[in-house]
């Protein structure tokens, strides 16, 4: 009899988890508290309790070739950076393609997940749900939690002296939907993550004045990177990842700073990060430098004091009149349906082995999927997490002893960044390629570069030097996708299809053959170093 798996949430990770369960012959039941799938990517005019919220203009920060599910490319006529409405439609297509809707119970809230009375023997869970006022309880062999980390706003008002005296309007960025509220107002956005920067830029088109307050600065990059290519298709390659990981940290930091400043000098715009030893993820925004240089956005340091109708910034004695304050200060996360004895969240971190499994459970029958913030898309990350997790839940793959897992979790906690402006989400960050490769190794699905070099050198070169697109993650092993090779070899065709809307003649490069030869030799050297 197939094992029954309860999946909490029908967002991007929940959908991947349903599919992975079906692939392994398990029986998934997904509980979604809202009336539709999509999670974060489903825009609504009003904020819904327990669900991530986004503003109308949100566009993906990862391009379509880097942010799709590994066995389901975006339609080729989609723009390279996908608006939220297109993204939601893509998720609907994914659910229909793999017949996932039959496994989802909508308008069903998970009230509690507790250990069954014989958990130490069976590993089973009691799941209590509420649907249209009716409460039900069922026993499941395993549970996959896919609720994400963007539902509980982090609003540290105690860090802003005088905020209680402010007579204007203030709210967390989670409440933001449209820029109309900023028309002819003086606006202050606190926090320079992607959301804070987006909101400041949007506000600057309508507001009287916009201030963007940042504690530590940030590197800002455009979606349009070298030679007009999508930033992540240039930046995120196996070759570059190996190169960065093989150099001393100061050199890597210097190289990254040089690259970041190639668009504009961050120091001249008051943006250069104060802590250049501990690199923060870059902020993606195509307009910010232009808004700053035209005086539409003013970069300010942290807030010293909030007054009735104004704000005083650190290192600046002047009071700046303010009508609206938007706190883009990030999120915390919690599992209200789980007891602390199952997953304890402390100081913004959960004791999860590889960001997935509670390290102390007697039976590895509960997995958390998507509670991670890679410098890359969550779709392929969640899919890879789910593939491994499902095989552990099924009993095909085994976890290390609890003591080993706890030690690794504790080590990660000790290395956690700290300080206001980093928020709890920083504790969830990981090295995208290295992390996914590690999980792929556990299920024997990591591409074997040496073998590919001998059997399919063209593919090997493309995988190593080209963008690390998700198709690589289902090239081999359990859940292998037969279309993976073709998707890899045609990834640039789909990228340019939506930009080359006017045909132009191109001259062939005389150096193309030499470049291919150099790439082949470089790959040989890299593989030789790996096997030394």
UniProtKB/Swiss-Prot annotation:
Modified residues (N-acetylalanine): 2
InterPro entries: FAD/NAD-bd_sf, Flavin_mOase, Flavin_mOase-like, Flavin_mOase_1, FMO-like
Main location group: endoplasmic reticulum
Membrane topology: Single-pass membrane protein
Catalytic activity: hypotaurine + NADPH + O2 + H(+) = taurine + NADP(+) + H2O; hypotaurine + NADH + O2 + H(+) = taurine + NAD(+) + H2O; trimethylamine + NADPH + O2 = trimethylamine N-oxide + NADP(+) + H2O; N,N-dimethylaniline + NADPH + O2 + H(+) = N,N-dimethylaniline N-oxide + NADP(+) + H2O
Ranges facing Cytoplasmic side: 532
BP GO terms, sorted: organic acid metabolic process; taurine biosynthetic process; toxin metabolic process
Family designation: Belongs to the FMO family.
Subcellular location, record wording: Endoplasmic reticulum membrane
Record-annotated site: Important for substrate binding: 208
Cofactor: FAD
Lumenal side: 2-510
Species of the source: Sus scrofa (Pig)
Keywords (A to Z) from UniProt: Acetylation, Endoplasmic reticulum, FAD, Flavoprotein, Glycoprotein, Membrane, Monooxygenase, NADP, Oxidoreductase, Transmembrane, Transmembrane helix
Described function: Broad spectrum monooxygenase that catalyzes the oxygenation of a wide variety of nitrogen- and sulfur-containing compounds including xenobiotics. Catalyzes the S-oxygenation of hypotaurine to produce taurine, an organic osmolyte involved in cell volume regulation as well as a variety of cytoprotective and developmental processes.
Transmembrane segments: 511-531
Enzyme class: oxidoreductase
GO CC term, one of those recorded: endoplasmic reticulum membrane
Binding, FAD: 9-13, 32, 40-41, 61-62
Positions bound to NADP(+): 60-61, 195-198
Tissue specificity remark: Liver.
EC number(s) per entry: 1.14.13.148, 1.14.13.8
Lipid biosynthesis found in the keyword field: no
GO molecular function annotation: flavin adenine dinucleotide binding; hypotaurine monooxygenase activity; N,N-dimethylaniline monooxygenase activity; NADP binding; trimethylamine monooxygenase activity
Residues carrying sugar: 120
Designated name of the protein: Flavin-containing monooxygenase 1
